[in-house]
Amino acid sequence: MQRNAMYLKNVAETACNFQLTQYQISHANQKPYECQICGKPFRKRAHLTQHNRIHTGGKPYECKECGKVFICCSTLIQHKRTHTSEKPYECLECRKTFRRSAHLIRHQRIHTGEKPYKCKQCWKAFASVSDLIDIGKFTLMRDFTNVQNVGRHLTIAQLLFSIREFTLVRSPLNVRNVAKHSIIAQHLLNTRELILMRNLMNVRNVKRLLGKVHILLNIKEFILVRNHMSVSNVGRLSLVFLILIDIREFTLVKNPMNVKNVVELLTIVQLLFNTREFTLVRRLMNISSVGRFLSPVQHLFNIREHILMKNLMNVSNARRPSSIMHILFDIKEFILVRNLINVSNVGRPLLLFLI
């Protein structure tokens, strides 16, 4: 009996000495136990043993319900509560229950108003570490913002001039997704930066990003090679679109256009003297279509420029593009070699034909 009493006394003293040693280590901020693989220090040997399982891959604790394995016993206990729906931690203020004590501590800060985590960039305080980590993504060097967002962690970013930083290579975006990222996006001068190579766009999608699109002088930059467009789509991009002198730049080679589509693009078109530039080689036009393009056409002295070689015309068609046709001194220029006229047809294209 005396031996058992002495043994229990020694065990109690040893346990007290061990606890005292651990307590003193916590005050001295010492971490005497170091991992031999990565060099990370720990205060307790049990923490080092648990950490070594990360390197060895050992997971000795297994759930009997679903067979999932864990590194430490406490994680297994928390996992079992998902099967039993047990929530032992209750808030005394609102009686809300939680599975983990850490969740209860974070919830209680809502009632107390405590925000112990502060951002070093703007000194804004947060109730949880996860909120601080999430909001820190907007202030890192790789996630650029503009001056309006500095000091204000905005979930809705405004005026993101370099939105490429918010898009990964393997998950390309189109302009429809850009609008969800930036609700107020105005005057993005370089839209090419908003388009990745694997997800092409057309001009129809540009309208959903930019509410007010002013005069785009060089719309070639908004069109990629594999997704061609026609001039009928250009009109939906620009509300106020002025005279495009050289519309050839707005039409790609594989998607030619005719003058019928040009009228949908240009609301105010005045005196386009060289219509050949608005017609591509593979889709020819005749003079009957020219009248739909130009509402006020005056003084077309050299109408040969409006007629292509493969679509001949006669003098009966020459009357349609010009409502006010003055004296044509040399009508030979309006007659091609393969479509001859006689004297009876000469009087038809001219309203006022003088000597």
From Swiss-Prot:
It holds the Pfam family zf-C2H2. It is found in: Nucleus. Coiled coil: none annotated. GO terms for cellular component: nucleus. Disulfide bonds: none annotated. SMART domains: ZnF_C2H2. Its main location: nucleus. A zinc finger (C2H2-type) spans 33-55, 61-83, 89-111, 117-133. InterPro entries: Sp4-like (IPR039938), Znf_C2H2_sf (IPR036236), Znf_C2H2_type (IPR013087). It comes from the Eukaryota. Keywords: DNA-binding, Metal-binding, Nucleus, Repeat, Transcription, Transcription regulation, Zinc, Zinc-finger. The keyword DNA-binding applies. The keyword Zinc-finger applies. One of its GO terms (molecular function) is zinc ion binding. Belongs to the krueppel C2H2-type zinc-finger protein family. May be involved in transcriptional regulation. This is Zinc finger protein 781.
